[in-house]
Amino acid sequence: MSVDNVLDKLVDEKKYRRRDLRNSLASRIGIEDRPSSTPREPPKKRLRFTNVPLDVSDFTLEDMVKEFAEPIYCNFYDLKDSRTAVFEFEDPSVMERVVEKYNETPLNGGTVTVEIFEQERRPDRRRRTQRDNRRGNGRGSRGSHYKRQDRPAMEDELNAELEDYMKSS
């Protein structure tokens, strides 16, 4: 065999696929079956205002924050007795300046707490492992009738039930 023939033969052969990946549905529909080895994004750093009195408007908080920079994300959460506001900025140094200025600041009769927190990304729903699917993910995969054990009726109970039936007819 010449070198050209060997090279031609090598090029014509298909790449070997692992047996455990051969029959998965993912390869047939064009998605990746295994989690990729790409590094995860670092967690997002956001700014959280807590214990904000209910009578403080969204616009007031936005104006306080816009003194430093325009937020790229903002959201407000109303709780029973206070509010929480979350902001995100392009530049993390802006958040530190906002914390320095507004942390433990009195606002409309309440003391506002400002802190920087890291928000972890939620795992992608499509990337559940098969082991999670076998367990049922706590979603009640089995019906409730599996949980109760029906005890056999005792002889005395059956006799009493039969007597009641016979008396009623």
Swiss-Prot record:
Residues 119-169 are annotated as: Disordered. One of its GO terms (molecular function) is RNA binding. Pfam families: FoP_duplication. InterPro entries: FoP_C, Nucleotide-bd_a/b_plait_sf, RBD_domain_sf, RRM_dom, Yra2_RRM. Coiled coil: none annotated. GO terms for cellular component: nucleus. It is found in: Nucleus. Associates with mRNPs. Belongs to the YRA1 family. This is RNA annealing protein YRA2. The gene is YRA2.
